[in-house]
Amino acid sequence: MSMQSHHVHLVSDATGETVSNVVRACLAQFEDVRVVQHRWWLLRSPSQVGRVIEGIQRDPGTVVFTVVDPEIRRALEEACRLINIPCVALLDPVMDALALVLETKGNQQPGRQYTLDEGYFSRIEAMHFALALDDGQSLDRLKQAEVVVVGVSRTSKTPTCMFLANKGIRAANVPLVPGIDPPAELMDLAGPLVVGLTRDPKSLSDMRRSRLRLMREDGDSPYAEEDSVAREVREARRLYARMGWTVIDVTRKSIEEVAATIMQKLGTAPWGEGL
């Protein structure tokens, strides 16, 4: 018996990133359901609402929107009311609470979070930095980093640094290679936060085997052999302990969770701020 499809319409006056992320987080809590998402972005005039409503009528389902323009909102909500479709204003509870506390109304301007402000250019600079100092490159610039991520192969060093860079944090990463001493630039480093990533040896071995298969190489090489991997992990952890570096086990953590932990250590994302 085939699973019934449920339709959800995501409507935004900007890129749709906010409503997409929130709905994705909510849907993750529901198992064994099939949801078809319909995306309607850059809704900037009441005349565009008709096209959206036509799509909703074709595939009826809950509407979740982030639209700030009052006229467009009214047109969308009224159209949904007439066809008896639930219509959820995603940001209203937060905006109302903030307006009450701040004793002022927010600017009703779509996409304000995407303006080319200082934060935007800081993120671009951080992305260039992370790319330039990826995988042990440009070690002479290591002291310019805010955080240096260290780990054996396949411990998510690069994606973690790229995620941090997207938050405007200058992040570099240095690989630990069996049989090769860590670079002096890393060992003599003073100033930046150094974070050592580790992973369960069995999980790490499985990941490396998968990588080798994708590359059509021998999956039984020492690179992926579990005992060899376990030795690598032990040696890395000994190094972390000797150097007093922060250690994060990434075995059951997403990239976002690892980055959030690092940001907490940096002090750039205390409780009440964040990703």
Curated annotation (Swiss-Prot):
One GO MF term attached to the UniProt entry = protein serine/threonine kinase activity
Which Enzyme Commission number(s) are listed? Answer: 2.7.11.32, 2.7.4.27
- Per UniProt, ADP binds at 151-158
Q: What does this protein do?
A: Bifunctional serine/threonine kinase and phosphorylase involved in the regulation of the pyruvate, phosphate dikinase (PPDK) by catalyzing its phosphorylation/dephosphorylation.
The family classification in the record reads: Belongs to the pyruvate, phosphate/water dikinase regulatory protein family. PDRP subfamily.
- NCBIfam families in alphabetical order: PRK05339.1
Query: Which protein, by its recorded name, is this?
Result: Putative pyruvate, phosphate dikinase regulatory protein
Organism this protein belongs to: Rhodospirillum rubrum (strain ATCC 11170 / ATH 1.1.1 / DSM 467 / LMG 4362 / NCIMB 8255 / S1)
* Taxonomic path: Bacteria, Pseudomonadati, Pseudomonadota, Alphaproteobacteria, Rhodospirillales
